Amino acid sequence: MRLNLETERLILRNLTPEDYRAAFLWCGDPDVARYMVYPVYTKAEDVRTWIETLDPDDPDEYDAGIVLKSTGELIGSGGIYYRPDDDLWTIGYNLRKDQWGNGYAVEMIRALLKYAGRTREIRGIQGTFADANNRSRRVMEKLGMTFAEDVTLTKLDGSASYPGKRYRRIFR
């Protein structure tokens, strides 16, 4: 979905291929990528290729670049993604490590849910995180999500698997 939203502290907008160098700061950081499904990016140009695959016209995917309103810096990305198989929206987010712990992921997800909820029915949300990723657990708890099931998470390239949790919140 095409985005241009503002919250108290953030601008949420679609990523563009020109954002690849800024996005490499989190996509190429092993600490950020540790529990993400993608392996750590080793070349900034590969981040550009990923950004080019995003479809801003897909009505089931609200992908957002997270920009600090105060500085104009692109500090992360994330979104909400409709999954018809369970009629829930999956949440996702990742931020530069120096921006962790500021509540930006929660602020972004709340804004996207409010925006999407104007034209779409949102029955509920879900998200997964690695057991060892307490920061993501806290994000989901702050969004009112609770434990739904244990899961095994595997990197897209198969390089690692780890135990995780799925959290959900049903609105209707």
Annotate the PLM regions:
Residues 1-34, 67-172:
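Acyl-donor (CoA/ACP) binding surface of acyl/acetyltransferases
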Residues 39-40, 63, 156:
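Sparse recognition of residues in long alpha-helices and their boundaries
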Residues 31-53:
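Conserved GNAT-fold acetyl-CoA-binding loop/helix
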Residues 52-65:
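A short helix-loop-beta-strand connector motif used in the catalytic cores of GNAT acetyltransferases and
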